[in-house]
Amino acid sequence: MNPPTNPRACSPLARAGSFAPIHVVGGGLAGTEAAWQIAQAGLPVILSEMRPVRQSPAHHTDQLGELVCSNSFGAAASDRAAGLLKEELRQLGSLVIATADCHAVPAGGALAVDRARFSQALTEAIQNHPRITLRREEVTEIPEGIAVLCTGPLTSDPLAKALQAFTGLEYLSFFDASSPIVTGDSLNRAVVFQASRYDKGEAAYLNCPMTEAEYERFWRALVEAEQAPLKDFEREERKFFEGCLPIEEMARRGKDTLCFGPLKPVGLVDPRTGSRPYAVVQLRQEDKAGQLWNLVGFQTNLKWGEQQRVFRLIPGLEQAEFVRFGVMHRNTFLNSPQLLWPTLQFRRRPTLFAAGQLVGTEGYACAVAGGWLAGQNAARLALGLPLITLPPETMMGSLFQFISSADPRHFQPMPANFGLLPDLEGRKLRNKQERYGRYRDRALAALKTTGLVRQVQTA
């Protein structure tokens, strides 16, 4: 079923003054981008940001688009997933990415910014736009009319409760306990085998069998690995983590604890030996194409480098390519596959949009992409124009297709990665650089067919 446009919307030829303002809630990267796109479409916008009236535990200023973690937007090269996403946004006229480009600082192969100048420039752009009204206020209820929610991982309690009431408690998460995801073509298929326990149902899992010696080596590395520190406000709110124990904490309870938990081998036979392994790590399919696989039960708070080192000790994962590392942190996000269309509209209320980390995307550029799409579509809904869904060959199109169609039982936030894209036609390219270049070329060609690409204006 396709998302509807508003049949009562005004004609696109109507005067901008005849439109009610579209309300954007949240002045982070997604909200700033959404407000800009709506205003650039000729429509009035109210952008509500609660800082400094109410400060979040992670922010330090009242500037829009404040970068609370790293100052890096990820890889700059367009043959990298994060770089391709940013290039798509450049071609689509993103304010945030253009501002990042203007305030870039040397960072090797990444796009990093002077965070103070970057946020100041975004704030000035929004304040100076004649169609944007910036309100410093806390929004405690979901706005009426056409609105875009971009309140991020630290959504304030009153609005979070309103979202709970609107979506249903089970569709809103308050912490992110994610397992790592690896690409299917990086697995050692000579070791990994496909099966379900006791051969019940379809063979839905990939299984990495371990001998006792392999398990002991893995267990010892796991309990000795270095964990990522929690932020102060996360340490104060440990209740968010009680429902999902990190695998390294489980391992510390005893050498064999994992063998009776997520690594239990019961009901599985290693076809190489004809017998039950000592332990088994199971991988669950994340996408329809079978390109992304989740390490079941491996929610973790290990540092990312440690995750790669330790988890590559698992037989079959020696050369595993990680598209997402496990995380455990405070993060309010929606079960988007149950709630949203790829247009970022709520299924039960098409005049309400959401974007940013709230919808279950991960990373700065992904937040900007969500803001761009939600802003564009909110404006189009008001104008009575067809709404946008970008081609699945593009990074943006594949990302929002994923978050609106993934298995809702296991949904966790997802970053941009090439595993989301459809397979390339023709023979499989073994050279990763060549393969990623082909993905880029196909994505940018598909983007041009939409008619949305804007001419880059030189200064």
Swiss-Prot record:
GO BP terms, alphabetized: tRNA methylation; tRNA wobble uridine modification
Family matches, as HAMAP family: TrmFO
A Pfam family recorded for this sequence: GIDA
Coiled coil: none
Disulfide bonds: none
Protein name: Methylenetetrahydrofolate--tRNA-(uracil-5-)-methyltransferase TrmFO
Subcellular location: Cytoplasm
Gene encoding the protein: trmFO
Binding sites annotated in the UniProt record for FAD: 26-31
Stated role: Catalyzes the folate-dependent formation of 5-methyl-uridine at position 54 (M-5-U54) in all tRNAs.
One example GO MF annotation: flavin adenine dinucleotide binding
